[in-house]
A protein has these predicted regions:
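N-terminal helix-turn-helix DNA-binding core of bacterial DNA-binding proteins
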Residues: 33-75, 164
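N-terminal leader segment of winged-helix/HTH proteins
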Residues: 1-46
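Residues within helix-turn-helix
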Residues: 65-66, 77, 84, 104
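Residue-level recognition of specific faces of alpha-helices
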Residues: 23, 54-57, 78, 82-85, ...
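C-terminal regulatory/oligomerization modules of transcriptional regulators
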Residues: 1-13, 137-169
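Alpha-helical linker/hinge and terminal dimerization helices associated
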Residues: 20, 24-27, 31-38, 72, ...
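Charged, amphipathic alpha-helical coiled-coil/dimerization segments
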Residues: 4-6, 84-148
Length: 169
């Protein structure tokens, strides 16, 4: 039986909207939307999704701007713009690198540490929501483990090894 043009178009539309890239994007978009809404409700209305490139790659130590940009996979110019915004809001501070006086290091301020702490609590809340929807925490953890395994096998790891494996740092 031959398919009609409408059926073929419907098949193509389905395939375009239900591929791995789209599914991962939708999941990520929903996860991040829930996080930003919760942070806004907790008193962080100026924090934007782009700022996660800083917080997800900074940690609690001091990091040079160049390394931070590399970890976040953005240009130094883009990282500098985000850092200026976060510095103006009081979440990060720039210090002179003790090893190289020409370089600047970025560190979290006390309000920045509070924001990170609140962010971690929000992530736990969002994970709880997903666990409920997916059939329990064990199902969510299996999904996370599968994604981590895929990232490792595809050699997409870009974090410092000590962040990936605490035994190494």
């Amino acid at each position: 039986m031959n398919k009609t043009t409408a059926e073929t178009n419907q098949d193509i539309a389905y395939l375009l909207s239900n591929n791995l890239s789209r599914l991962l994007s939708e999941f990520s978009r929903d996860f991040e939307r829930r996080i930003w809404q919760a942070l806004d409700a907790r008193g962080y209305p100026d924090i934007r999704p782009s700022h996660s490139a800083v917080f997800a790659n900074l940690g609690l130590g001091a990091v040079r701007v160049t390394e931070l940009a590399e970890r976040a996979q953005v240009t130094q110019q883009a990282m500098g713009k985000m850092l200026k915004e976060l510095e103006r809001m009081g979440y990060v501070a720039r210090d002179v690198d003790s090893d190289d006086k020409r370089a600047k290091e970025i560190r979290l301020t006390e309000p920045g540490i509070e924001l990170v702490t609140d962010s971690l609590a929000v992530v736990d809340e969002v994970r709880g929501h997903y666990a409920t929807k997916l059939g329990g925490m064990q199902e969510l953890e299996k999904l996370e483990a599968s994604l981590r395994d895929a990232v490792r096998k595809l050699e997409l790891d870009y974090l410092p090894e000590s962040w990936v494996d605490p035994q190494r740092g």
